């Protein structure tokens, strides 16, 4: 009854108006799963391949008809008749069909769309919510949200080089309360920006993209003001997280790495100077998480950064690890970072995503389930976060429907779980001093 009878791929548009892949999988019992694939703006060079058409006369070369065709031909033919309950086997078949180390032939966007749609169809066939199907009876932890309320870098035309300034409602007692706290701070930040005569336009992930702020510290000072205006205490109720996305402004010069802050006066920092700068920031502001603080190939720098502040701060590898167990294994062996960002389309299949989360936890690393800057109404990552009891999710501000779709799904899951739902707040940082 759970055999696959149809696989349908199509081209839809994401939150930036760029084409992306959507897939329907239909089972013999009539159950249907649908999944849409996100896309990043600041992408790591080690990510799985997002197959684009490169036809400049159509969507500026960003069409995905090649990937859609791969879904509707090769992948469909390989999966028809397979049992949707055999997720690992289905993903294995697609990886073997692709025959490349980075999914460059069929496209990670094609493979992931099918992988997620299969899981959703299987869950529907069994009459289970997706998080319960993926994680089992112990799936009960609602994640601490990292709410990106101020955008910079590649995500916005603002005056800061760091890409994301996030707040974490660590003092909340439930996910619902966390959402309220985050929304209130976000709205107060908007009022402050408006009063300062600055822009309240938002970036790709729904955070404000002001043009008049004075660099990184100016952004942190504004957010601190907004937290206080909302009636919350810095460090106790709300903590900060940064996504530097350093690979976007990192240059290798004579075997060493330099970081060029073009939007902040043209400052250039070495790896050691970056580490010192981060130390100064965490001593001044309640920053408990720094993502991609150094370039994706600056392994020695990552080890230094982790030794310097890894006992006090979550050091998250995004471009460094790209949700890839081989790169994560290297990081664990070297002592680079203490946390991994989980982006499903970086690796391109559900099975490999779950493997990365499991490897991280076994090594004492935390895992942060994440959206991409180009999103859709698909809320799968909300279910993945609860299924794996990951403890943290990063999915934008309380603005833009493509971001709110994930938060609203988590609110529904919390309601469904009822009294067994857990929200652990500050305790999700189990590998640092709190």
UniProtKB/Swiss-Prot annotation:
GO molecular function: magnesium ion binding; phosphopyruvate hydratase activity
EC main group: lyase
CDD domains: enolase
Gene3D superfamilies: Enolase-like C-terminal domain (3.20.20.120), Enolase-like, N-terminal domain (3.30.390.10)
Domain of life: Bacteria
Positions bound to Mg(2+): 243, 291, 318
Entry's Gene Ontology BP terms: glycolytic process
Location within or outside the cell: Cytoplasm; Secreted; Cell surface
Transmembrane segments: none
Name of the molecule in the record: Enolase
Species classification: Bacteria, Fusobacteriati, Fusobacteriota, Fusobacteriia, Fusobacteriales
Gene giving rise to this polypeptide: eno
